[in-house]
Amino acid sequence: MSTPSSSLTTDESPASFILPDLVSHCPFPLRYHPKGDEVAKQTVHWLDSNCPDLTAKERKAMYGLQAGELTGYCYPYTTPERLRVVADFLNYLFHLDNISDGMMTRETAVLADVVMNALWFPEDYRPTKGQAAEELNPGKLARDFWSRCIPDCGPGTQARFKETFGSFFEAVNIQARARDEGVIPDLESYIDVRRDTSGCKPCWVLIEYALGIDLPDFVVEHPVIAALNQGTNDLVTWSNDIFSYNVEQSKGDTHNMIIILMEHHGHTLQSAVDYVGSLCQQTINTFCENKQQLPSWGPEIDDMVAKYVQGLEDWIVGSLHWSFQTRRYFGDEGQEIKQHRLVKLLTVAPPPPPPPPTPPPQSSDADTKKQKVKAQDGKGPVSDEEVWALVRAEQSKGSILESLFGFLTTSLSRIFFGYFFAYSH
């Protein structure tokens, strides 16, 4: 495949960039579930019918996402019933990603409590301290798909799903805190958090559910299995950073490896994309090498491991191809961009208007007199003695009652502000 000219992307303010050819580098065959399209229609209707507050724009994006089709690529050998449960989760996961974008730290913590409550108490809603008496919609959706997942889900798989989904929310909270503070993390910190904000880990657990297996803990915790899991996570996550960069930069979102490389490591846009692309290619190579290092645990476990590893491969190749099919990243031009790999940058959306200015507080009589003293002598901080000297001088201009009122007002103000600053610091 020919490579577009890089001259289009060498300006300080580029108008476009070139994608790495990750699809051609991936050695795994692409598969699709025979019932994938049918289940995709069912799952998007499930989310649509259970989210009455979505706007018309949000509904259009939901249908353009094609999360059900992603499920068909990544879980091609499961039963239609289990495919539907996994598809509902993937649609739900993207929904959580959308509603958590822009949330403050406190709001993401509330969201996490609501969802994890549904996973730990799937039979009925049990509000904990501080939770609303009526269950919020994200909790209802989680309880719906999870209650359908449990009957065919092994105990180890259930435990791992709840653990990894909990880690997802912890990482989302870290991301929200960085967003609150306007911080762009360093590369190492970003990679560590991104492995959880991606939501990939619970998706890997659902490979077990989809295939009807329940891997022993000692297998899941084996270094080679852990390396295969992390390699798949990195490949899916980092390639997603490349594919989603254009949309994210247009919204001012900084939770992206491309932006971090430009911010902290002096990369241009194109060199950052090329660098992440090379990391993805190296990760695919390392995955294949690690696969050859798998030990044997006996025929029964080896068969489960082989199915599980193939599930990881299906995720790698499926997510790469789906990224050009969904409208989430490239709109209606995905298939064309898949061929020529040239991405034209979207216009950056203007920032929201600033809030109206807060009117200045009314100055007290004592404050006004302090300003007068400062203006008269040009000195720094004004002492209490100087203020009261001016007060006494001006008291002769008014009645005794006015003088007494001025004294009481100033004294009470001094007491109030003294306590205020003492306790606020």
Curated annotation (Swiss-Prot):
Its EC number is 4.2.3.125, 4.2.3.126, 4.2.3.23. The keyword NAD does not apply. InterPro entries: Isoprenoid_synthase_dom_sf, Terpene_cyclase-like_2. Mg(2+) 2 binds at D97, D101. A motif (DDXXD motif) lies at residues 97-101. Residues 349-362 have a biased composition (Pro residues). Binds 3 Mg(2+) ions per subunit. Belongs to the terpene synthase family. This is Alpha-muurolene synthase. It comes from Coprinopsis cinerea (strain Okayama-7 / 130 / ATCC MYA-4618 / FGSC 9003) (Inky cap fungus).
